[in-house]
Swiss-Prot record:
Pfam families: Acetyltransf_1. It comes from Sanguibacter keddieii (strain ATCC 51767 / DSM 10542 / NCFB 3025 / ST-74). This is Mycothiol acetyltransferase. It comes from the Bacteria. The gene is mshD. GO terms for biological process: mycothiol biosynthetic process. Catalyzes the transfer of acetyl from acetyl-CoA to desacetylmycothiol (Cys-GlcN-Ins) to form mycothiol. Belongs to the acetyltransferase family. MshD subfamily. Residues 8-145, 163-315 form the N-acetyltransferase domain. InterPro entries: Acyl_CoA_acyltransferase, Bact_Acetyltransf, GNAT_dom, Mycothiol_AcTrfase. Keywords: Acyltransferase, Repeat, Transferase. 1D-myo-inositol 2-(L-cysteinylamino)-2-deoxy-alpha-D-glucopyranoside binds at E39, E190, K229, E243, Y281. Acetyl-CoA 1 binds at L81, V82, V83, H89, H90, G91, V92, G93, T94. Monomer. It is an enzyme of class 2 (transferase).
């Protein structure tokens, strides 16, 4: 089928549509062994206030493809898309991507697209639409069963004098955490833009545990954090997985080796709650973070890539 003949629907999602997106994402993950959509798009499926555009290609009784465009940053936009395994090689992905590009061109926005797992099909789609890789996001992992070098065999990473750790207090620490997060990730296009609404959505998730959201304080001021995530619905016959969900240090506390100390504290907490494999995501060009995590025993597992048109990447 010519992709120009495919009907791409752009409209807010109904509750039934949101359920269909979840089914579509699960079907693709089952085949590809990589989740096609990250957490943020899934949290925003029914968020009428979110600056997002939803694109759908419908099949007879379900979705053949879905894309979400995040228009929250001035002059730019970021998209994620997924095509059902039964609908691949029929132009669905091309239709979704080209429609998204046309919409953002009309708004004067530069569009980039995430490909989770950097799969051959995504690379092929990018080549057909003239996109090139402009950014890498590494997924790193660490078994806590002793099969690799872990912090248990490395020197301890004590907190700097005057720095203490405590658990996050929902509703009390929100503003302070959002401020530190924005400063720590000032150059990060997603993490640094988190809002109170974004934080509240995550606190409401089944996996949230305030005891696994560690805050570092100095003289009563928040200077760093290590937020951990242990998904609630894990299979019983597989190793229990936990994630260093977000780790940040306020610029005012740089030089205190807080990143190393927070990583060690996070790993200790994950051991306490029975995690056997730890995952995290970090920018491929963040040499400081990669060095910290590598020293803790992490290795690169997979790579997500963000792609854009060459002219946009150099603009």
């Amino acid at each position: 089928m010519d992709h120009s003949e495919i009907d791409v629907e752009t409209s807010p999602l109904t509750a039934a549509d949101a359920q269909a997106v979840h089914r579509l994402a699960r079907a693709a993950e089952h085949v590809d062994q990589v989740a096609p959509l990250s957490e943020q798009p899934l949290l925003r499926l029914l968020d009428a206030e979110a600056p997002t555009t939803h694109l759908m290609v419908r099949a007879a009784d379900d979705l053949a493809g879905y894309a979400q465009v995040d228009r929250g940053a001035p002059g730019t936009a970021s998209a994620e898309l997924v095509v059902h395994p039964f609908a691949r090689h029929h132009g669905v992905g091309t239709a979704l991507l080209e429609h998204a590009l046309e919409l953002m061109d009309a708004e004067g926005r530069v569009l980039s697209v995430w490909a989770h797992g950097d799969l051959p099909a995504a690379r092929s789609l990018a080549a057909r639409t003239g996109l090139v890789v402009v950014r890498e996001l590494w997924k790193m992992h660490l078994p806590l069963d002793g099969s690799t070098s872990t912090p248990e065999s490395a020197p301890a990473a004590p907190l700097a004098p005057g720095v203490s750790l405590r658990a996050f207090r929902p509703g009390e620490d929100d503003a302070a955490w959002l401020a530190v997060n924005a400063r720590a990730f000032a150059s990060h296009p997603e993490q640094g833009r988190l809002t109170q609404t974004d934080l509240a959505a995550r606190v409401a998730e089944p996996w949230f545990d305030a005891g696994s959201f560690l805050l570092a304080e100095r003289d009563g001021d928040l200077v760093g954090f290590c937020w951990l995530k242990v998904p609630a619905d894990q299979p019983q016959d597989a190793p229990r997985v936990g994630e260093i969900y977000a780790l940040g240090v306020d610029p005012s506390a740089q030089g205190l080796r807080l990143g190393t100390a927070l990583t060690a504290a996070g790993l200790d907490r994950l051991r306490e709650v029975g995690v056997e494999v730890v995952e995290l995501y970090t920018e491929g060009d963040n040499t400081v973070a990669i060095r910290t995590y590598t020293a803790a025993g992490f290795t690169r597992a997979t790579v997500d890539v963000q792609m854009a048109r060459p002219s946009d990447a150099t603009a």
